[in-house]
Amino acid sequence: MGNALSKISMIAEAFFAGFYVSITRGLFIPMLAYSGYPVRDISLVLVPTAIGGILVSSIVYRDPRLFESRFKRVIISSHVLERLMWFSLPFLLLSPPILSLAYMLANVSAALTSILIGAAVYSMFSGDEVIEVSIHRSAASSLSSLLGSLVMTYVSAAYTAPSSYYLLYFTALLVGLSGSMLLMMTPIPRSISEPRSSVVEEVKIRSGTALLILSLMFAGSNMLGISWSPLLKELGAPVYITVALTITGNVGGILGSYVWRGYKAYITAMLLNSLLTAAITFIAVPTYHIAVSFLTSLTFLGVNLLGMHVFSEVNDRIGRIRASAYLVSSNYIGLLAASLISTFLQSPSQNLILAGSIKMLSTLIALITIQEAAIVPAKRAYEISKIIYSTSLLGYSFTLQASRELLKTFISALALTALLLVLYILYRVALTLIGV
């Protein structure tokens, strides 16, 4: 009975989170695009966010003991902070540097929340229960996201900006905090203990290869998210068409949670998703994009389930927090790659074609490294995985170091901007006082 209640609580939390996420994330890029932000500026807003997410995942992975003794308390604190930070974003549209910083902090707290929620699922359930709960959480999230998308579409059509932005983000805040209250009553372990033994090479290789596959898929997905709204704007589509993409996308997410089963099905979904992404730029009728959104979401669920399946198999050997950190970091590595690429490619069409190509590369890697579904013998797939893991490890180390330096530079530049602003204000005040 207790285990059943735990499942219901975690699924219900995902339901509340889905509504809140569908509005805060689903509206953010369209909000920037229709506020006059070009693709390059949208990408620059996202770069510090990706860096922050990667660093948080790295810190959590390197020293999970920071969270073991106060596990539940940290989850709830991060859960609440994340929702408050996201609520602030529409009020900062006129100041891109401050918006970028707030967006980074919102995503840093979101990254930590996602890692710890994932670790909680791994801690509360085992084996097939993890997959079962994850599938139901995904479906519940997609269902409530659909409701959120309907609300978002109606409000966007009924109210003018920025009033519609304020109303939607405030509604999302209230629903999101309802999920936080539910989480307080959920029997999550107050503390957990992670394994201290070294991880065997085979597990490292499997985890590292999965990280690369997921990172590439998320890079393509984030490039799609960055470029789709600007493409529709070029086609002359009204904003409610852009918002409506999330409605059909959420319907696809609900069905996709139950369509894909097993590694072969996951990779089939990845292949279809890659082809669909590359085809978007050639669809000239805006309303057709709504149907494509359904199909891309339906197939992308296979990617999420592949990641969850791999790390549910290895979490007892690398630790629940570390397994979850791996899973979450792939999204932020993908976001960083997508943001940097989109900074240099100004054309939404070029971005979408490249996004499809990156997803196809990820699919090909999965086809030759995931032993359960590889098109080569299992032994050969392991050897290829080992080579790819060694290569990608160097790339990840470089990315991590570069992220640290870029984050330092960003914070320094922001501090300098703030200092100059303060000096200018003092200068104007002084002129006023002396009557000049």
Language model: regions and residue ranges:
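Helix-loop boundary and gating motifs at the non-cytosolic
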Residues: 1-55, 204-246, 404-435
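Cytoplasmic membrane-interface "Motif A"-like loop-to-helix N-cap segments
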Residues: 65-80, 261-273
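Substrate-agnostic recognition of the 12-TM MFS/MFS-like secondary transporter fold
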Residues: 9-29, 45-61, 75-82, 102-160, ...
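C-terminal transmembrane helical hairpin of 12-TM major facilitator-type secondary transporters
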Residues: 266-304
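A membrane-interface helix-boundary motif in multi-pass transporters
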Residues: 154-174, 343-361, 402-414, 429-436
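Juxtamembrane intracellular "pre-TM" segments in multi-pass secondary transporters
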Residues: 1-7, 187-214, 382-410
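C-terminal membrane-cytosol helix-exit motif in multi-pass small-molecule transporters
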Residues: 173-192, 363-373
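C-terminal ends and interior cores of transmembrane alpha-helices
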Residues: 77-95, 271-286
